[in-house]
């Protein structure tokens, strides 16, 4: 017997997060492996699923947890490239291997339409696995599937608009995706501006290498000073995690032919922007706006190569023991974290 967490409904919130016993799977189908999970990390998505706020496909009851890493315990038939004892991490979409995502691919999300990683053992398809970076701990590896791959896709997923040395990159916030975007953009030789409502978090961003920072609480109309920081050129890439409240300003400081990667909607809702004005700004800047829905196994492998080559280490804010998942959810919900919140499983 082993322990796992299960989300049973969308109304009980974090109170339903209690360890439950289950039988460790022994039979594997061809192409499957049994992974003994060592660590997992939290995402905003995991939190809102328990509160009925998740707008995408969901099949309850489900073991939550979008991110996880561990060691292969058992290998099924017809598995190539992996063997018992390998350290691995699973892609968020288990059926998104490469290219343009399909409905089939995006309906294979860990912790949503199939059981996730807040459990001791998980059966996973081998085609969704990636060999873990050799330079990272399991707590660090577990932060990669959602936040890191999303940031990587936002910066490098469009062949026509990959970030280049000397580009200006605007990163909103200092959560998981934003922190990875800062690190990857710097590794590519870009100039990076970071926004946050916390001077403490902005100081941390500077320590990571941020070129400029803006406190949007002190400067609510931050687009103009952000633009000045680029000498009027604007930003070639914007990592946009705010949504309705921040998008108009992101567009206002975009460079000509710049790319906005739409990733989230974590900012409090603002007044609905004047759509005609927004369209005018998009046209004026020849703007590119691209929705980012995590990424593929192929992107994950490319990202791991970069992490190893540049010795990039994820920012882990706090690690909780396995029996304190509810406390971990509450901590992340408070938005006190910088980078990632991790659950140590074993």
Swiss-Prot record:
Q: Which Pfam families match?
A: ADH_N, ADH_zinc_N
EC number in record: 1.-.-.-
UniProt keyword annotations, A-Z: Cytoplasm, Oxidoreductase
Q: Which domain of life is it from?
A: Eukaryota
A Gene Ontology cellular-component term = cytosol
Read off the Gene3D superfamilies from this record: Medium-chain alcohol dehydrogenases, catalytic domain (3.90.180.10), NAD(P)-binding Rossmann-like Domain (3.40.50.720)
Molecular function (GO) terms listed?
A: oxidoreductase activity
Q: Where in the cell is it found?
A: Cytoplasm
Cross-referenced CDD domains: MDR7 (cd08276)
**Entry similarity comment:** Belongs to the zinc-containing alcohol dehydrogenase family. Quinone oxidoreductase subfamily.
- What protein name applies here? Zinc-type alcohol dehydrogenase-like protein C1773.06c
Please name the source species.
Schizosaccharomyces pombe (strain 972 / ATCC 24843) (Fission yeast)
């Amino acid at each position: 017997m082993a322990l796992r967490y299960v989300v049973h409904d969308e109304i009980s919130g974090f109170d339903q997060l209690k360890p439950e016993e289950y039988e460790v799977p022994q039979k594997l189908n061809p192409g499957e492996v049994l992974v003994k999970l060592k660590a997992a990390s939290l995402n905003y998505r995991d939190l809102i699923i328990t509160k009925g706020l998740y707008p995408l496909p969901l099949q309850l009851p489900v073991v939550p947890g979008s991110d996880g890493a561990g060691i292969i315990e058992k290998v099924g038939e017809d598995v190539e490239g992996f063997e018992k004892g390998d350290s691995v991490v699973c892609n968020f979409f288990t059926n998104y291997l490469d290219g343009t995502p399909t409905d089939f691919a995006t309906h294979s999300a860990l912790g949503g339409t199939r059981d996730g990683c807040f459990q001791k053992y998980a059966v996973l398809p081998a085609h969704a696995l990636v060999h873990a970076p050799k330079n990272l701990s399991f707590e660090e590896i577990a932060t990669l599937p959602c936040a890191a791959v999303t940031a990587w896709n936002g910066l490098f997923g469009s062949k026509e608009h990959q970030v280049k040395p000397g580009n200006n990159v605007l990163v909103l916030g200092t959560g998981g995706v934003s922190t990875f975007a800062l690190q990857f953009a710097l590794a590519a030789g870009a100039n990076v501006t970071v926004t946050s409502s916390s001077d403490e978090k902005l100081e941390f961003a500077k320590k990571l290498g941020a070129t400029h920072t803006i406190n949007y609480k002190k400067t609510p109309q931050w687009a103009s000073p952000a633009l000045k920081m680029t000498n009027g050129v604007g930003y070639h890439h914007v990592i946009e995690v705010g949504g309705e409240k921040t998008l108009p300003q992101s567009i206002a400081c975009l460079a000509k032919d710049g790319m906005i990667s739409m990733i989230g909607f974590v900012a409090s809702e603002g007044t609905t922007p004047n759509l005609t004005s927004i369209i005018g700004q998009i046209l004026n800047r020849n703007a590119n706006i691209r929705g980012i829905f995590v990424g593929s196994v192929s992107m994950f492998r490319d990202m791991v190569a970069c992490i190893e080559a540049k010795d990039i280490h994820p920012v882990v804010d706090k690690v909780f023991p396995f029996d304190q998942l509810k406390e971990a959810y509450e901590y992340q919900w408070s938005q006190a974290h910088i980078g990632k919140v991790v659950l140590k499983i074993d």
